[in-house]
């Protein structure tokens, strides 16, 4: 026996314990679900490790979880004969939160109990949920393959610290005893525990057992036969079969939902799921879930994602990311293959034909689920899009084979609806295209307001041509990889010519040519005045109400792409913009009449800076712009 050691909880654990006790109080029975789930995982891990080392079973291969209560002592005990933990493992797993992004998680907490409980559920509280109902927790554990004298006793009141000491334990596995708070003694009741197991843990694939007391002998009477005494025994409270191996028709929605909560540690029901068994060239079963809410650490680069992998119903690994592309990293679930070796490793999965085929199949399955949802329940799909739309937008750059299908699932804001809500599909847009229209017009800006109010839309609005309004950071990246849909090119209204084609009649083209001819002198004067600040000056084809605008040339980087790359730390030289003038605007007409070359230069500079500010949202030298504007305002009032 070793001397008892006291360790302090990691700061984040203290915070989590405090939050959990206060935020999850209304859903306190989940402690049993979490602990049974952990115990089942420990059994799965032992089963996998024992594939290459049968001695780990120590002569006992019947894996199970046992739950018991002691009313007098006010305790509940959850015991498993799974993989167990070493002393170092106990300190690591029961004293710290080994998750990247933990600090970010705590920043997201708002103080609103209902919102925070949902976030805490997404975070996954696991073992620490014990302290929702217990004021002291005792853990006795021994790792499989270690001697009886290498067992560990861990104890804590869930406050600042915990104690650890080495003890003797004959059986492998982990035994957790909860010393219930005075107002939580209802859980020290067999009937209450049975009802929770039935509710939350029926899908667990190892038996979850409780002790059933024996019955005394009954002597025979004139009317009845004698009944022999029966001994008490441990009886399973759950079906103890892997849920995904059952027929879909035999699994209820409630069971699917509880299984999702078991594998994801999410407290909320999933949005939808798909359960499929495939036989033939590939033999596998998949159970895939789309969550209702995005995880708090969705954008954390170190976040683990992927499916649980089983081979012939034996658990092999968590977070097998090889089966799901990054743009579908929100998908939860499992895949059970009959074609992979049981000793498969992440390295073997990397370049494996079976893995590639399974990845292709489950990717198509998820896209099919989303297509069906979008078609049959637009409101529910909109809910999905709000949570995961930005992630799905990574798809066209990542998955060339499914680019068109992914594009069909994208949603955008549009001038057609006048709303900021992105609820317009590319198919919707094409359906509303005007006769003679050959392009899908879009604009990318810093915000929805900037996109909707951009001067670049003026002529298109006047002609009733719909424009997709994009304002998320990923949109410029997306649009660089999604250049057409259903045979229609996507065309930026802020780059090059509008290329209206048949949308302009002969009279309009003639008037435009006439305007360009009449403005040749003005265009040359402005270019001479601005010099190399602009690449070109030309008469606009897109403005009706604004005096001037800047556009990127064909093939040049857009303003938004430059911002994106600069934000990523890349040094990007900014190309000179094309400066477009609207000769029919009074300010440009005034400019054309100006004979004083100094005044002309100031007016030209002012219009250029205005156009740059409108396009970029900022200026390289705002002080110089304000000084120029003040000079001109003073001149106008003299």
UniProtKB/Swiss-Prot annotation:
It holds the Pfam family HATPase_c_3. Belongs to the heat shock protein 90 family. It is found in: Cytoplasm. InterPro entries: HATPase_C_sf (IPR036890), Heat_shock_protein_90_CS (IPR019805), HSP90_C (IPR037196), Hsp90_fam (IPR001404), Hsp90_N (IPR020575), Ribosomal_Su5_D2-typ_SF (IPR020568). One of its GO terms (cellular component) is cytoplasm. Residues 347-563 are annotated as: B. This is Chaperone protein HtpG. It comes from Shewanella pealeana (strain ATCC 700345 / ANG-SQ1). HAMAP family: HSP90. Keywords: ATP-binding, Chaperone, Cytoplasm, Nucleotide-binding, Stress response. Residues 1-346 are annotated as: A. GO terms for molecular function: ATP binding; ATP hydrolysis activity; ATP-dependent protein folding chaperone; unfolded protein binding. Its main location: cytoplasm. Homodimer. Molecular chaperone. Has ATPase activity. Residues 564-638 are annotated as: C. The keyword ATP-binding applies.
């Amino acid at each position: 026996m070793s001397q008892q050691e006291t360790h302090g909880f990691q700061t984040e654990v203290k915070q989590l314990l405090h939050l959990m006790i206060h935020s999850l109080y209304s859903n306190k029975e989940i402690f049993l679900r979490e602990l049974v789930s952990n115990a089942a995982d420990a059994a799965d891990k032992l089963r996998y490790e024992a594939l290459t080392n049968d001695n780990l079973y120590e002569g006992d291969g019947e894996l199970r979880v046992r739950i018991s209560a002691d009313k007098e002592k006010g305790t509940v005990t959850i015991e498993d004969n799974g993989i167990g933990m070493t002393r170092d493992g106990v300190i690591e797993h029961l004293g710290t939160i080994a998750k990247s992004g933990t600090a970010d998680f705590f920043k997201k907490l708002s103080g609103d109990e209902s919102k925070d409980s949902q976030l805490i559920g997404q975070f996954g509280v696991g073992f620490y949920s014990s302290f929702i109902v217990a004021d002291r927790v005792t853990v006795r554990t021994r790792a499989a393959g270690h001697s009886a004298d290498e067992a560990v006793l861990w104890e804590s009141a869930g406050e600042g610290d915990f104690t650890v000491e080495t003890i003797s334990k004959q059986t492998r596995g982990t035994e957790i005893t909860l010393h219930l708070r005075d107002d939580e003694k209802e859980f020290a009741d067999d009937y209450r525990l049975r009802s929770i197991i039935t509710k939350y843990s029926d899908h667990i694939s190892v038996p979850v057992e409780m002790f059933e007391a024996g019955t005394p002998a009954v002597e025979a009477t004139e009317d009845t036969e004698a009944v022999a005494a029966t001994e008490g025994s441990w009886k399973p409270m759950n079906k103890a079969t892997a849920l995904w191996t059952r027929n879909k028709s035999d699994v209820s929605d409630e069971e699917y939902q509880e299984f999702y909560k078991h594998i994801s540690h999410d407290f909320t029901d999933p949005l939808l799921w798909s359960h499929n068994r495939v036989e033939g060239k590939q033999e596998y079963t998949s159970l895939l879930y789309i969550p209702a809410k995005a995880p708090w650490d969705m954008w954390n680069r170190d976040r683990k994602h992927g499916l649980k992998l089983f081979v012939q119903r034996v658990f092999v690994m968590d977070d097998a990311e090889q089966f799901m592309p990054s743009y579908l990293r929100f998908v939860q679930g499992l895949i059970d293959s009959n074609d992979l070796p049981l000793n498969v490793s992440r390295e073997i999965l990397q370049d494996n034909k079976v893995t590639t085929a399974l990845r292709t199949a489950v990717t198509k399955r998820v896209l099919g689920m989303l297509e069906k949802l979008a078609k049959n329940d637009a409101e529910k799909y909109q809910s999905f899009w709000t949570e995961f739309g930005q992630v799905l937008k990574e798809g066209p750059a990542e998955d060339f084979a499914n680019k068109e299908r992914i594009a069909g699932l994208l949603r955008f804001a549009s001038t057609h609806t006048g709303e900021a809500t992105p609820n317009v599909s590319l198919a919707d847009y094409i359906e509303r295209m005007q006769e003679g229209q050959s392009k899908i017009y879009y604009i990318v800006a810093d915000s929805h307001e900037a996109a909707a109010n951009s001067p670049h839309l003026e002529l298109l609005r006047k002609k009733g041509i719909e424009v997709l309004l994009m304002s998320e950071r990923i949109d410029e990246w997306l649009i660089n990889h999604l250049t057409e849909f259903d045979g229609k090119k996507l065309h930026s209204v802020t780059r090059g010519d509008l290329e209206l084609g048949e949308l302009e009649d002969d009279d309009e083209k003639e008037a435009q040519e006439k305007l360009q001819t009449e403005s040749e002198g003005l265009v040359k004067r402005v270019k001479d005045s601005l010099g190399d600040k602009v690449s070109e000056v030309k008469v606009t084809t897109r403005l009706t109400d604004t005096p001037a605008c800047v556009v990127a040339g064909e093939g040049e980087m857009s303003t938004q792409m430059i911002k994106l790359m600069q934000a990523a730390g890349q040094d990007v030289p900014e190309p000179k913009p094309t400066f477009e003038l609207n000769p029919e605007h009074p300010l440009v007409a005034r400019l054309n009449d100006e004979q004083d070359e100094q005044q002309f230069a100031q007016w030209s500079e002012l219009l250029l800076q205005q156009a740059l500010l409108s396009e970029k949202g900022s200026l390289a030298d705002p002080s110089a712009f304000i000084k120029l504007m003040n000079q001109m305002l003073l001149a106008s009032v003299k």
